[in-house]
A protein has these predicted regions:
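C-terminal transmembrane helix and the adjacent membrane-cytosol boundary/short C-terminal tail
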Residues: 106, 188-196, 272-305
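Membrane-interfacial helix termini and adjacent extracytoplasmic/periplasmic loops
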Residues: 15-19, 136-177, 241-254
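Transmembrane-helix boundary motif in ABC transporter permease subunits
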Residues: 7-9, 18, 48, 52, ...
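Transmembrane alpha-helical segments of polytopic membrane transport and secretion proteins
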Residues: 1-30, 114-117, 292-305
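Transmembrane alpha-helix signature in integral membrane proteins
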Residues: 78-112, 171-178, 209, 282-284
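Membrane-water interface segments at the C-terminal ends of transmembrane alpha-helices
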Residues: 35-57, 120-158, 174-176, 231, ...
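Intracellular coupling helices
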Residues: 118-124, 185-225, 299-305
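Interhelical loop and adjacent transmembrane-helix boundary motif
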Residues: 22, 57-58, 72, 179-182, ...
Length: 305
């Protein structure tokens, strides 16, 4: 009996020991890059927090005064900051929702087998390949008043970028035009790992195209869609370049990033600007953790199914 237990226990111990060694080796290999990322990412955050707790002057080198949470009180007591938060949330919800729906449609089109598929994929990805600043300049040229492309086509002299809510809508549309291909690319990657045999079996069972989409495609795509939503939501909350180039953050288009930049660079209120940047970081982190908990729970539930 003892010999049998030793014989069966030894391979298990060896397997467990090998697994631990592999985990330790993996940690050692990843450690240098993780340390580098932590240092590069942590230093700006630490410095921004330090700066947000001080009144800092560039006129006298090294002159700073402890301000405690005064800068945070000023930011949270500023109606412009709350307006920027509202604009940011509207931009995030609207742009991410549209990009997900359009990206899904584009991914389905790119995944379909037909002549010219390669040309379609290349054409669809062109807007995403452009620099965001270039995209903003293109859209500003289209809507600039009074002789922009849109006004010329419709024979109007509407000040599109100078009034609310048109300016924010144009920024949302510009972001959707540029970033929907990115969502399509992520969703397409999810489509390509769905086994074709599943669809063949559904066809044999008499499932319609809509039934195959709702019962097979969407459920199996959900992990890819949820991951894409995380990336885009966190990126949208930090939007800066589109509103800055198109409107300068004016006319109801200010965001958390543009108002922080205005305080920091334009008004030289470095402590206040840093406090606004830290508040933006906190908003992004809260949304990030909420998403991770939600997505993690959903993915585990899908795995159990």
């Amino acid at each position: 009996m003892e010999a049998a237990s030793i014989g069966t226990g030894t391979p298990e111990r060896l397997k467990r020991s090998k697994g631990l060694q592999e985990k330790q080796l993996a940690r050692l290999m990843v450690a240098p890059s993780m340390i580098l990322i932590a240092v590069v990412a942590a230093w700006p955050v630490i410095y921004a927090i330090w700066l947000s707790l001080h009144e800092y002057s560039v006129r006298v080198a090294g002159l700073s005064r402890w301000a405690g949470f005064d800068n945070y009180s000023s930011a949270l007591g500023n109606s412009d900051w709350w307006a920027a938060l509202g604009h940011t949330l509207i931009f995030t919800v609207a742009s991410v929702a549209l990009e997900t729906l359009i990206g899904l449609a584009m991914a389905l089109a790119m995944h379909a087998a037909f002549k010219g598929q390669g040309l379609l994929r290349t054409t669809v990805l062109v807007p995403w390949a452009l620099l965001t600043v270039v995209t903003a300049i293109i859209w500003r040229t289209m809507f600039v008043s009074p002789y922009g492309f849109v006004n010329t086509i419709f024979g109007t002299k509407t000040v599109w970028l100078g009034s609310e809510p048109q300016a924010l809508i144009i920024i949302i549309l510009a972001d959707v035009w540029k970033t929907a291909p990115f969502m399509a690319l992520l969703i397409l990657a999810g489509l390509q790992v769905i086994p074709g045999e599943v669809y063949e079996a559904a066809k044999v069972d008499g499932a319609s195209t809509m039934q195959r989409f709702t019962r097979i495609t969407l459920p199996l795509l959900m992990p890819a869609i949820l991951v894409a939503l995380i990336f885009r939501t966190l990126d949208a909350l930090r939007v800066f370049d589109l509103p800055y180039v198109l409107t300068g953050g004016q006319n109801g288009t200010s965001t958390l990033s543009t108002i922080a930049q205005e305080a920091f660079a334009a008004n030289r209120l470095y402590g206040l600007g840093a406090a606004m940047a830290v508040l933006t970081f906190i908003v992004v982190m809260v949304v990030s953790f909420s998403y991770i908990r939600f997505v993690g729970g959903n993915l585990r539930g899908m795995g159990d199914d």
